[in-house]
Curated annotation (Swiss-Prot):
<dbReference type="GO" id="GO:0051701">
    <property type="term" value="P:biological process involved in interaction with host"/>
</dbReference>
<dbReference type="InterPro" id="IPR045034">
    <property type="entry name" value="O-acyltransferase_WSD1-like"/>
</dbReference>
<dbReference type="GO" id="GO:0004144">
    <property type="term" value="F:diacylglycerol O-acyltransferase activity"/>
</dbReference>
<dbReference type="GO" id="GO:0008374">
    <property type="term" value="F:O-acyltransferase activity"/>
</dbReference>
<comment type="pathway">
    <text>Glycerolipid metabolism; triacylglycerol biosynthesis.</text>
</comment>
<dbReference type="InterPro" id="IPR004255">
    <property type="entry name" value="O-acyltransferase_WSD1_N"/>
</dbReference>
<dbReference type="InterPro" id="IPR014292">
    <property type="entry name" value="Acyl_transf_WS/DGAT"/>
</dbReference>
<keyword id="KW-0808">Transferase</keyword>
<dbReference type="GO" id="GO:0006071">
    <property type="term" value="P:glycerol metabolic process"/>
</dbReference>
<keyword id="KW-0012">Acyltransferase</keyword>
<protein>
    <recommendedName>
        <fullName>Putative diacyglycerol O-acyltransferase Rv0221</fullName>
        <ecNumber>2.3.1.20</ecNumber>
    </recommendedName>
</protein>
<comment type="similarity">
    <text>Belongs to the long-chain O-acyltransferase family.</text>
</comment>
<feature type="active site" description="Proton acceptor">
    <location>
        <position position="139"/>
    </location>
</feature>
<keyword id="KW-0443">Lipid metabolism</keyword>
<dbReference type="GO" id="GO:0019432">
    <property type="term" value="P:triglyceride biosynthetic process"/>
</dbReference>
<dbReference type="GO" id="GO:0001666">
    <property type="term" value="P:response to hypoxia"/>
</dbReference>
<keyword id="KW-0444">Lipid biosynthesis</keyword>
Length: 469
């Protein structure tokens, strides 16, 4: 048994009927032409043989009586793979758009807390001897880095326990839960002086710094109202696109930018197009960009990240200026978070009362209007650098996306995988007519950036990826 951290628990409390807090991982897998018999039962056997490597798949959420403390993970519960791993069939021959639509349907329902907080869907019907595995994992269980590490373990790209047998442990009693909660409360009280000291040290660094705080961080409650900011519907829609990583790296190098800057700039250009289309005007936006502070390859669970607020120059019609301003704003936001301390929010999250936090997030999710903190979430996660396998089958593509937050109907998540930069977009049912408007806008903006920089507008074709939708 282990206690959810305050930050893990906040991600649990923020889930409501219309704000689902699961993340999605999509792996496209190419079957050998002589191994077409690989089906959902064979896949269940593969996962069963690796459960000892993928410990979080056995975590069962256990609430503390009277909500006396954050919930706990029972670390080795009974796992019913027939429940967790489910078949799904596309109408053959399915392509990118058909798979995206299936992922949107899968994302539209929350996870059942009576079971470990994950599901996998074995999707058949893709063209070219391919299948897909869609993993739905609660954010309280793992952040982007932990999910990438767990996926790498599952594909044998990272070492885990070589020999092992999955053995369930007994469920705790109410007395054990209350006793552990009381002891942990005493420990948390003992950590308050260190948390206050961490906070005052951060504020002291801010006072002494010549750069101070970024404008986005000092005015965090003023994002403009837009088409994407409203009360969410429970429905989810999903879209993907792929760029060649070599093209993005070359463009970034020429412009003195990072891959993360390029992701922000492409997102800004696409959002500008959509703002003009849906709102008739384009104003600067405020994006929350997660920043991890624990990149340990051994970590496969938990949340060790903070969110920095980055202003996006969606009002600018100059693609190169958008890259430059995104770079400057990202640098400023990173410096601000380093000054304050990257663990500031997560440390104080330990003291959020469970019942009060759940009530607050229910109220926020039902409000009809803009999010008062941000317009959208944008993530860029470095994924595996080597091609993975599931059994003997080759993983050709990986896509990932995080959840939507209250009042924000758009999430853009980018994962790199070997030679690919894979874009994923999640929306609710009322933000855009088609989420592929966002992915198409990002590709179009990348082409405009390259054109303005004097680079070829002919993009490298990623042969291993599905054709664009």
């Amino acid at each position: 048994m282990k206690r959810l951290s305050g930050w893990d628990a906040v991600l649990l409390y923020s889930e409501t009927p219309n704000v689902h807090m699961h993340t999605l991982k999509v792996a496209v897998i190419e079957l050998d032409s002589d191994r077409q018999e690989f089906g959902v039962d064979a896949f269940r056997e593969v996962i069963a043989g690796r459960l000892h490597k993928l410990e979080p798949l056995g975590y069962q959420l256990v609430d503390v009586p009277l909500k006396f403390h954050h919930p706990m993970w029972r670390e080795h519960c009974q796992v019913d793979l027939n429940y967790h791993i489910r078949p799904w069939r596309l109408r053959a021959p399915g392509g990118r758009r058909e798979l995206d639509e299936a992922v949107g349907e899968i994302a539209s329902t929350p996870l059942n807390r009576d079971h470990p907080l994950w599901e996998m869907y074995f999707v058949e019907g893709l063209a070219n001897h391919r299948i897909a595995v869609v993993a739905k994992i609660h954010h309280a269980l793992a952040d982007g880095v932990a999910s990438a590490n767990m996926m790498a373990r599952g594909m044998d790209l990272l070492p885990g326990p070589e020999v092992g047998r999955y053995v369930p442990d007994p469920a705790p009693t109410k007395r054990q839960l209350l006793s552990a909660a009381f002891i942990d409360h005493l420990r948390h009280l003992g950590r308050i002086p260190a948390t206050i000291r961490y906070t005052t040290q951060g504020l002291g660094r801010v006072r002494r710094s010549s750069r101070k705080l970024s404008p986005a961080l000092t005015m965090p409650f003023t994002p403009p109202p837009t088409f994407m900011n409203h009360r969410l519907t429970p429905e989810r829609r999903f879209a993907t696109a792929t760029l060649a990583l070599i093209d993005v790296k070359a463009t970034a190098k020429l412009l003195g930018a990072t891959i993360n800057d390029m992701v922000l700039a492409m997102s800004t250009g696409a959002l500008r197009t959509l703002l003009l289309r849906y709102d008739g005007k384009a104003e600067p936006l405020l994006a929350s960009v997660p920043v991890s502070y624990d990149f340990s390859p051994e970590r496969i669970s938990g949340n060790r990240f903070t969110g920095m607020l980055v202003a996006l120059p969606a009002d600018s019609d100059d693609p190169l200026q958008r890259v430059r301003v995104c770079h400057e704003n990202a640098v400023s936001a990173k410096e601000s978070h380093q000054l304050l301390g990257p663990e500031l929010i997560s440390r104080w999250a330990a003291y959020w009362p469970p019942a009060g936090a759940e009530a607050l997030f229910r109220w926020l999710s039902e409000r009809d209007g803009q999010n008062k903190v941000l317009n959208l979430n944008i993530s860029n996660v470095p994924g595996p650098r080597e091609r993975g396998r599931v059994g003997a089958a080759l993983v050709t593509e990986i896509y990932s996306v995080g959840p939507l937050t209250a009042g924000s109907g758009l999430n853009i998540t980018v994962w790199s995988y070997v030679d690919q930069l894979n874009i994923s977009v999640l929306t609710d049912g009322s933000t855009v007519q088609d989420p592929h408007e966002v992915t198409a806008g990002m590709i179009a903006d990348f082409i405009e950036i390259r054109r303005a920089a004097g680079l070829s507008v002919e993009l490298t074709v990623v042969e291993s990826a599905m054709a664009q939708a």
